[in-house]
Regions:
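Short hydrophobic alpha-helices and adjacent helix-cap/hinge residues
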Residues: 3-13, 25-316
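Hydrophobic core
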Residues: 15-23
Length: 316
């Protein structure tokens, strides 16, 4: 009798284990044979480095991926055509690069997992259950920690913003800055014409001017005015990229685009293996590099530690 019970238990366990391993390997089999549609908004070195990291990461995971590349070169019509082809095709995954490609794909493609890259904001991705991605904007914590390494602690940070675009960001940044021992002064503008007076209000109020992505504040037309204000008032300006650093910003955070591609691949595999669940929220880049303008530091009489200068990817 006991022997009969043991046999029944063994059979039940065998059936259970078979089902578990069957489901596991079915998921792995699906993830290891992918047909990937890539929509590139533009052709540039950062886009190529990101795509290279994405491909390399999948290959390292022994994923057999067949890529079909749709290059839009900034043409909205080409993007729409690509999206329609993808919708009627048999694709496992869509990898979008740039806002032009991402916005169209998020609107039109609802039944295929989407991973997005080369975009600044994540608002639209958060509202799309089948999508995730890596945004270009660093987390507030990352930006302020970098500031701590380069500039004195306890300083007053100033920023200028348009509330429609960055109201929520500034509110969050103010709270985080305060928790890290900074004073925070933000000035809202409603038109580009408000910028000169906003800058002047900061002349005797802040120790550093923090540039945040804002289409009203930071433009090719306003850049000269902002950088001249920085030098004349000896208030360092923190830029958005090496182009800003080269033009006169004290420093800017830079991205490792290859690693962003690797991050996207990791998100893609997670998304594919958990398709019944909502996609995870988009994430910022995990690696922060930086460029420094040593000449600007000298003009502003700011001492930059030698290890910080040596760690920069570019020194001007």
């Amino acid at each position: 009798m006991q022997s009969s019970k043991n046999k029944i238990i063994e059979i039940v366990m065998l059936i259970t284990l078979t089902a578990v391993f069957s489901n596991t390997f079915q998921g792995m089999s699906y993830a290891k044979n992918l047909r990937v549609a890539v929509i590139k908004s533009f052709a540039s070195t950062p886009f190529e480095e990101t795509l290279s990291g994405f491909k390399e990461s999948l290959k390292k995971e022994e994923i057999e991926a067949d890529f079909e590349i749709f290059s839009a070169n900034g043409d909205p019509i080409k993007v729409r055509e690509a999206v329609q082809q993808i919708k009627s095709g048999d694709f496992s995954l869509v990898f979008t690069m740039g806002s032009l490609a991402t916005d169209n794909a998020l609107t039109e493609i609802t039944n295929i997992p989407i991973v997005s890259s080369m975009i600044l904001k994540d608002d639209k991705i958060k509202k799309t259950p089948n999508a995730t991605g890596v945004v270009l904007e660093f987390s507030i914590e990352t930006q302020l920690k970098c500031m701590q390494q380069i500039l004195p602690k306890g300083i007053t940070i100033g920023t200028i913003y348009n509330s429609k675009e960055n109201g929520k960001f500034v509110e969050t940044a103010a709270a985080i800055a305060k928790s890290m021992g900074y004073k925070f002064y933000a000035k809202e503008i409603n038109t580009p014409q408000d910028l000169p007076s906003a800058l002047e209000s900061m002349a005797n109020s802040v120790d550093v001017l923090w540039g945040i992505p804002d289409s009203m504040v930071l433009t090719p037309e306003t850049s000269k005015h902002i950088l001249l204000f920085s030098l004349r008032n000896r208030i360092p300006f923190i830029g958005l990229s090496s182009a800003w650093t080269k033009a006169g910003a004290l420093y800017s955070l830079e991205r490792n685009y290859n690693d962003i591609g690797i991050q996207c691949a990791e998100l893609a595999l997670s998304l594919l293996r958990n398709q019944k669940e909502r996609a995870t929220n988009p994430v910022p880049p995990r690696k922060a590099l930086y460029s420094i303008n040593f000449k600007t530091a000298q003009q502003l009489k700011i001492e930059i530690p030698e290890n910080i200068i040596n760690g920069a990817i570019q020194v001007y």
